[in-house]
Amino acid sequence: MITTKSLPLSWEELQQLATFERDTVNGPTNSQTRLRLFGQAESDVRVTLYRDHHAWCPYCQKVWLWLEEKQIPYRIEKVTMFCYGTKEKWYKQKVPSGMLPALELDGQVITESDDILLALEDAFGPLNQVGMGDRRALPLRQLERLLFRGWCTWLCYPTRSQREDQRSREQFTSIVAQVETALANTPGPYFLEEFGIVDVVFT
């Protein structure tokens, strides 16, 4: 026996359901938005994040994640990555190197993701009790740099022999084991007691 509950929805019913609009300014994060307010006034915005169009750049992502986690109102300007085309002239005037990310805070342009995070902590405070310069965060930040370097050495640079490739792979695997050990040192899923700057940096 067929009931009305088991009948498929009509096209008209489906269209009515599709009219839902996501609040990209105050709702969940989304890579397409150009403004995030978290319920505050647009006049409160002190920060502009310059990031890649497609939300692929890991350095942009960690600054983006920090702003989202701290719920700091900010604007987003999207910039072409070097590997995808010509850098916009307006951006090269603002950031001559053309590198991403960049952040404008109260009119001052800051580059390099770690320098940006330090400036954000100075302006708005750390995500929790552990900031970028905390003695508990520093060795883990160094481990993240080792992980990145090991990954790049293994996968991004050409090797001259199979033996050299194997050595790079083993080095990367060894660093991953160190990361796993660091994660296992806390009872929860984060590098320290709670989600914080170290997790943002590893993201």
Language-model-derived ranges and their functions:
Residues E193-T203:
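GST superfamily/GST-like fold recognition
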